[in-house]
Amino acid sequence: MKKAKGLIILAAAVAVIVLVVVIKNLTAEKNYSKKYAGYDLTADVQGLGRDDSYVKYLEKYENAPIAQTAFSINAADFAEAEDAYIMDECGGLTNVLYTGDSSEVSWKVNIPETGMYNIFVKYYTVSSRGVEVERAVYINGEIPFHGADDLSFSRIWTNNGAVRTDNRGNQIRPSQTERFEWQGQYLKDYMGYIVHPYKFYLEAGENTITFKAVNEPVILSNIDFCVITEGTGYEQYAAEHASERTSAEAANAVIKINGEDAAARSDASLYAKYDKAAANTDPYSITATILNYIGGDPWKVPGQWIEWDFNAPADGWYNITIKGRQYYERGAVSGRSLYIDGEIPFKEVETVEFKYSNEWETLTLADANGTPYKFYLTAGDHKIRLEANLGELGDILNTLSDNVFRLNQMYRKILVLTGANPDKYRDYNLDQVYPEVIEAMALESKRLYKVIDDCVEITGQKSDKIATALTLAIQLERFVEDPDEIPKALASFKENIAGLGTSILSMSEIKLDVDYIVVQGTEADKVKDRVGFFRNAWHSISSFFATFFVDYNAIGDVYDEDDEEVIEVWLLSGRDQNEVMKMMVDDTFTPNSHIKVNVQLIDAGALLSAVMAGNGPDVVLTVDAQQPVNYALRHAVEDLTQFPDFYDVVADYPESSYTSYKFEGGVYGLPETQNYNVMFYRKDIMEELGLEVPQT
């Protein structure tokens, strides 16, 4: 009886919990429009806000006309220059300007008419550290807005040779090398929050335009001041090519471009990868490591691009299908801009959206009704590029960035009065000392609610990434209702601001995988690449049995262990690092020394038992710093000082880097990496105080 009574009570409790959850979901606010409706969210409270933002800059010149006259200046026709010189020839162009990594170059530019312009720069990267080129632009001695002080110019990377196949049938991707050629780029937001190129206001007459180096040298050819255009819509694009016809050859053509066959990319990290988990990648293999897609985690920063070459067999209209996968962030959208031969054909493909899915999806570029877009191509070689693009999410992230800036201003003002550890027994009278802060908190809360609604409208659901914004909005409302709560919750307020900043960075990551792109005639069969139950089942079963026969821990070429000219190397790090190591060994060490190397990827826990059993390797890499001496105590490793070239090798190392590997006069390991300290500073605080960063 008691047992039955207990079960009834338990069932009733569960029912109550379920009922509460259901009621909560039914009564939960679908949006927060009531919180901010009727309020002006664009006006800042006096003394709290960013006056130098790009949005404020556009508001300042909202009535300025769009200039209708485009013109160009030669970079070599400068007025003043430091760390720069004219080159007679570079990359087929003459009379160009080399600018060093500490350069500052000014041009006197006669502007034909007052208005807003885009600025386009033609440049040529030079061999250096391989990072992006960065410049700050000044107009008449001043940086026009925040963001113009940090303009990035990408490099071009390509495969250093062909894909190699080892003696077990596994493909080994080539390393990346920089390709030097002339390229062009508009001045734009390096963070990608502002999707379109920056607009600059210039008055008619003489103006001084200055480029100041922030990072890396670069060669400049010309600087173009362009007419701002809104872009061509698909209807206009189709009308402009209405007279073009399609031959039978073009109408039935199918050109398949594999993702891993990319011809160029903006970052060396955007290399080909392999996926054995899916049953429908192309190419496909269960046992061998076959490169079959590109993108992934490295392809997440707005502005990064990958480009492929292809050949159209005949003049005509073509459809484009992309097989991609965005399984990195639930409730998020990864956007890509489509370029054909360096141009976005029409506005509708400025942002091609890939929604969350666990599976590979084929996306045919089409309108809202599902009618495929038609692209007109002439016969011959073409280039197709996909560039990471935040799309509508960029405006939200830009707004959130300004939110964080203002919230930090509020926090610092309060901190001046309360200190880092406020006295909970003291009445600070914040509403009387800083009434503008309380007013700003009320306004910022409404702005955050608006951002949350905008984000949900784009993604279709409340992402966990925007949860911090909601927490802050609620917290700010409570602060406004009861200012005495602010000192007590100051620590959590600071943490929430930091959390929102982290969320912004996370939301700006737009990862995507690409298996292949199909450019096909309008009469060709539609691309279908879905995986059925039986195909998935066969893939899973085959993959399972392959584990009994394939050594997945071996990297690259594997040689006979009994060969006297073979050494065994074990690595404890990730597979990607191991593949790079094996590639370096096979490309340089083995050809020069005629010593073959087997590389094995193993678990760190297996090392000690293997060594004690006499089955250990000749060399171990990526071990913890304390391990060499631990093994030296057991006489399980060799003293490196016995080798005649030891002191020549360690001459390049600071002695402190291998001190921990010394034991009883011997040295039992060499460092692979060395840590060092760096100092970060708050740019916003330095700017607020009007201080320059000390160059000491």
Over which residues does each language-model region extend?
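Immediate post-signal peptide segment of exported/extracytoplasmic ligand-binding proteins
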Residues: F549-E568, E664-G665
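Early extracytoplasmic/lumenal segment of secretory-pathway proteins
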Residues: E564-E568, L572-V629
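Extracytoplasmic ectodomains of secretory-pathway proteins
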Residues: G499-G556
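Extracytoplasmic
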Residues: K3-V518, T522
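Helix-loop-helix "hinge/cap" segment bordering the ligand-binding cleft or interdomain interface
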Residues: G532, N598-I602, T641-P644, K662-T696
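Short, solvent-exposed loop/turn elements at domain surfaces
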Residues: Y271, D576-V580, M679
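Pocket-flanking alpha-helical
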Residues: A604-E638, A651-Y668
